[in-house]
Amino acid sequence: MPYIPMPYVVEQTHRGERSYDIYSRLLKDRIIFLGTPVDDDVANVIIAQLLFLESEDPDKDINLYINSPGGSVTSGLAIYDTMQYVKPQVSTICLGQAASMGAFLLAGGAAGKRFAVPNARIMIHQLSGGFQGQATDIEIQAKEALRLKAKLNEIMARHTRQPIERIERDTERDYFMSAGEAKEYGLIDDVFLHKKAAEKKPQ
């Protein structure tokens, strides 16, 4: 994978110039960007950002932009639980794609504040993974996978207001949606072309 240098932003202050990496500068405006697969390291950074922004201002919304193919279920659940835990409402915005755990986090945003741009792609499916080891270990892992699957379906049904039976059926295979279809499904609240359209939504 080619190395992509980190962009930096230089601002003028009364003390002179100050340089920020692009993610730190976005954080100043209460913007968090998830633009990678979800793993433990990514989850820890996003959780830290959520907690920091809560400590900065517990009453002001946080904007989580998502362009992610998904990833680890446990890492995604850690981010999701923190989104529900912090006092500020977390608005979610899909750019590009929100697949698997990316779609789960998109749906987990504050009610009325979940958005996607017109050409975004959203995909839900059941968790996947292979099991190795002795027969007893495989049985334990399979039971845990079924427990997690049921938990994810339950949460998704609650956020989309879809019957859990439909969530179970739709996630048996990769289920792709356009932004408009995701709105009809209840996974997002609106599709917008310009940022100002989202800002007009009631806070």
Swiss-Prot record:
GO terms for cellular component: cytoplasm; endopeptidase Clp complex. Its EC number is 3.4.21.92. PROSITE patterns: CLP_PROTEASE_SER. GO terms for biological process: protein quality control for misfolded or incompletely synthesized proteins. Keywords: Cytoplasm, Hydrolase, Protease, Serine protease. It comes from the Bacteria. It catalyses: Hydrolysis of proteins to small peptides in the presence of ATP and magnesium. alpha-casein is the usual test substrate. In the absence of ATP, only oligopeptides shorter than five residues are hydrolyzed (such as succinyl-Leu-Tyr-|-NHMec, and Leu-Tyr-Leu-|-Tyr-Trp, in which cleavage of the -Tyr-|-Leu- and -Tyr-|-Trp bonds also occurs). Coiled coil: none annotated. Disulfide bonds: none annotated. It is found in: Cytoplasm. It is an enzyme of class 3 (hydrolase). CDD domains: S14_ClpP_2. The active site is at 100 (nucleophile), 125. GO terms for molecular function: ATP-dependent peptidase activity; ATPase binding; serine-type endopeptidase activity. Belongs to the peptidase S14 family. Fourteen ClpP subunits assemble into 2 heptameric rings which stack back to back to give a disk-like structure with a central cavity, resembling the structure of eukaryotic proteasomes. Cleaves peptides in various proteins in a process that requires ATP hydrolysis. Has a chymotrypsin-like activity. Plays a major role in the degradation of misfolded proteins. This is ATP-dependent Clp protease proteolytic subunit. The lineage of its organism: Bacteria, Pseudomonadati, Myxococcota, Myxococcia, Myxococcales.
